[in-house]
């Protein structure tokens, strides 16, 4: 996905369209199934060189990942970034905790919201924004089993309706 933003350039007398690239590397599909996601936030992530190379090749799994607030900092836990094949003997630990980078006021706000009953901070996706790795975080409330069943039945009925509409339009 590309989003364009116009940057005013007065000394040249015209506007330049600056393309900000957003390349999604991975999404946490389990998060959409297990949680009601509410607010979204963007955080940077501290990675080693071999980790960013593994990310770019798509060797990451965020199925059980969550964010742990600890001593005024946010840490990404249980995100598996596979070892880079070409790194030789100097590779990283795949399941290590990774520090998330945000402003202190944002961290304090998130920590106060996480202390509320039932809210968890969940990584939804990892993406590149102008070649810098970012994590999209979301506040989520856990779904009960009947909530999961309701969302599945709603999705199935919507899919059936779309199929019928498509079939009707095709027959005309």
From Swiss-Prot:
Transmembrane segments: none
Compartments, as annotated in UniProt: Cytoplasm
Main location: cytoplasm
Pfam families per UniProt: SmpB
Family matches, as Gene3D superfamilies: 2.40.280.10
Domain of life per record: Bacteria
GO annotation terms (biological process): trans-translation
InterPro entries: SmpB, SsrA-bd_prot, SsrA-bd_prot_CS
GO cellular component, one term: cytosol
Keyword set, alphabetical order: Cytoplasm, RNA-binding
GO MF assignments: RNA binding
Family the entry assigns: Belongs to the SmpB family.
Function: Required for rescue of stalled ribosomes mediated by trans-translation. Binds to transfer-messenger RNA (tmRNA), required for stable association of tmRNA with ribosomes. tmRNA and SmpB together mimic tRNA shape, replacing the anticodon stem-loop with SmpB. tmRNA is encoded by the ssrA gene; the 2 termini fold to resemble tRNA(Ala) and it encodes a 'tag peptide', a short internal open reading frame. During trans-translation Ala-aminoacylated tmRNA acts like a tRNA, entering the A-site of stalled ribosomes, displacing the stalled mRNA.
The protein, known as: SsrA-binding protein
Organism in which the protein naturally occurs: Dehalococcoides mccartyi (strain ATCC BAA-2266 / KCTC 15142 / 195) (Dehalococcoides ethenogenes (strain 195))
Gene designation: smpB
């Amino acid at each position: 996905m590309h989003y364009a933003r116009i940057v005013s350039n007065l000394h040249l007398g015209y506007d330049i369209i600056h393309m900000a690239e957003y390349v999604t590397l991975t999404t946490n599909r389990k998060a959409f199934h297990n949680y009601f996601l509410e607010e979204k936030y963007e955080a940077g992530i501290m990675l080693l060189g071999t980790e960013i190379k593994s990310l770019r090749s798509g060797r990451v799994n965020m199925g059980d990942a969550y964010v742990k607030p600890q001593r005024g900092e946010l840490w990404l836990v249980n995100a598996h970034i596979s070892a880079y094949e070409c790194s030789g003997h100097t590779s990283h630990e795949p399941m290590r905790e990774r520090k998330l980078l945000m402003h202190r006021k944002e961290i304090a706000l998130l920590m106060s919201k996480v202390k509320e009953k039932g809210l968890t901070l969940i990584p939804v996706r990892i993406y590149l924004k102008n070649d810098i790795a970012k994590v999209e975080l979301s506040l989520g409330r856990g779904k009960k089993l009947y909530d999961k069943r309701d969302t599945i039945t709603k999705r199935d009925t919507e899919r059936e309706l779309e199929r019928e509409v498509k079939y009707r339009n095709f027959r005309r």
